[in-house]
Amino acid sequence: TRIKLATILPIIVGSKRELTAIRRNFEKNISALLKEKLSISDPAREVGQTNFHLAYHGRNDRALQVKIAQLYERACPSLLYTAPHCRPSARIEKAGKVKIGFISRYLFSHSVALTARGLMAELTKEQFAKYVFCVPPVQKDQVSALIRQAVDHAVVLPGSLAAARERIAEARLDILVYLDIGMEPLTYFLAFARLAPVQCVFPGHPVTTGIRTMDYFISSEALESAGADAHYSERLVRLKFLPVYYHRPEIPDKRKALREFGLDEGRTIYLCPQALFKVHPDFDEVMAGILRADPRGEVVLVEVREKH
């Protein structure tokens, strides 16, 4: 679709000048489409992508994200579905356990699940009825099994946007927690709906959603600057601690030597264990400066599975 073409972003950006030009063109494309009467019935299927790479530009993305969300709202009003129990006419249920749901595509051995698994487990079942909503395709491993054990209800969502909305609505949640809005299409477009009275997003993908049905962005004092509220369309919640709960990993007894990774043990190794698409153009000069200052230095970056 035209929206898909307008919202494509380069994966690797070569310079700050290029980055500025990319963002200017991106915003121009969205503004032009907002002036037209576009209509789509299922953006998760017809567009099938998010604005994932904006988060790595190191800029304030609020205005862009809000504008993109407005475009989708106008082109597909059904995105603003409201679950029956969230409508003004809904009867308020008697007090009981707080029904809280967590939703993600990455509820397996993935950084999203590894940071959130402990949080799910530590919420007491005396106070909370805990749900996880798994976005297909579902991957099963030890971490996914531990998550299922920690909650009361584990639900595999249908792949259809409309059917997934209905399935979540059936749970009549009090709180719905999105762990990583923006990392894949289904959860991004589900977030436009009102599926719980309180909806919040965790920093699994650390950028504002721009979506007006998202109430809170859960972050930390350690991660946000004094003026960071201006970067979020949601109400920014600064916890006094990081919103993660890591379990200590098991360290293998036998550790590999540098030579087993093809590295020279006589050199000073500077490891940057991040995917290349997360490396900002400003960091190029940082790496170059390290190598200029240390003639025996060697910067090691990580090759990701995807080829670009």
Sequence positions of predicted segments:
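Substrate-binding clefts and catalytic carboxylate motifs of secreted carbohydrate-active enzymes
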Residues: 271-282
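Nucleotide-sugar-dependent glycosyltransferases with a strong bias toward membrane-associated enzymes
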Residues: 112-113, 280-284
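A conserved nucleotide-sugar
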Residues: 127-129, 288-308
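Short acidic-capped amphipathic helix/loop micro-motif used as an active-site/signal-coupling element
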Residues: 117, 284-288
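Alpha-helical solenoid repeat scaffolds of the TPR/TPR-like class and their adjacent stem/linker regions
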Residues: 1-265, 275, 306
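Short, well-ordered beta-strand segments
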Residues: 99-101, 271, 300
